[in-house]
């Protein structure tokens, strides 16, 4: 999943947020990852990030969404679906969180910037770009989604083709939205189970 879904599933727990944003930057076993300022709750956030991604990759609704894109985008379909689901979430944010999206996203940015010194330098460019560009709120608009896809295409050569995928979000919005509605409650249950397991352990 992409950033907004991930942050939603960390609740309002700053340490989980910080760990989650590290999820794509930490390779190998989480318990062996060391960095000054890293807490056990942040490690849990890294593992939560991995749990979200692993569950998402296998969910039938996500697989259906990928099949819409697969004839054109092949293995890149998953990356595009992740971004499209952030759009669905942002468009219908009030259904999922009591705080308005602009207030929520500014709170996330403040948390990340305030704790930048506790995070590895490799993640700093992502956080700075995300907050300066207001990516999370931008996902609510078609323009913001197109900008996100084009940015990914520029930053990651392997994803060079996805910059043109935005029109399919409009064309198939109702189908992506229905798949998201089926998927998100199941993902929330899995995240709750994971966090309960960590608390018991």
Question: What residue spans do the PLM features occupy?
Answer:
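Short coil/turn segments at secondary-structure boundaries
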Residues: 19-20, 98-102, 161-165
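An N-terminal structural lobe/cap that precedes and organizes the functional/catalytic core
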Residues: 1-97, 169-201
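An amphipathic alpha-helical core segment
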Residues: 105-193
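Active-site-proximal alpha-helical scaffolds that flank and shape metal-associated catalytic sites
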Residues: 68-133
């Amino acid at each position: 999943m992409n950033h907004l879904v991930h942050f939603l599933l960390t609740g309002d727990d700053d340490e989980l947020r910080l760990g989650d944003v590290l999820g794509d930057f930490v390779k190998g076993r989480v318990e062996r990852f060391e960095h000054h300022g890293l807490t056990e709750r942040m490690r849990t956030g890294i593992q939560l990030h991995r749990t979200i991604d692993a569950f998402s990759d296998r969910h039938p609704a996500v697989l259906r969404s990928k099949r819409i894109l697969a004839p054109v985008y092949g293995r890149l379909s998953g990356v595009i679906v992740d971004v499209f689901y952030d759009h669905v979430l942002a468009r219908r944010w009030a259904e999922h969180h009591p705080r308005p999206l602009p207030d929520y996203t500014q709170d996330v940015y403040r948390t990340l910037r305030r704790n930048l010194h506790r995070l590895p330098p490799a993640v700093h460019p992502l956080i700075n770009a995300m907050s300066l560009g207001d990516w999370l709120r931008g996902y609510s608009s078609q323009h913001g989604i197109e900008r996100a896809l084009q940015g990914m295409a520029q930053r990651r050569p392997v994803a060079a083709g996805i910059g043109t995928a935005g029109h399919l979000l409009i064309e198939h919005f109702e189908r992506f939205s229905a798949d998201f509605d089926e998927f998100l409650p199941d993902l929330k249950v899995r995240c709750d189970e994971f966090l309960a397991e960590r608390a018991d352990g």
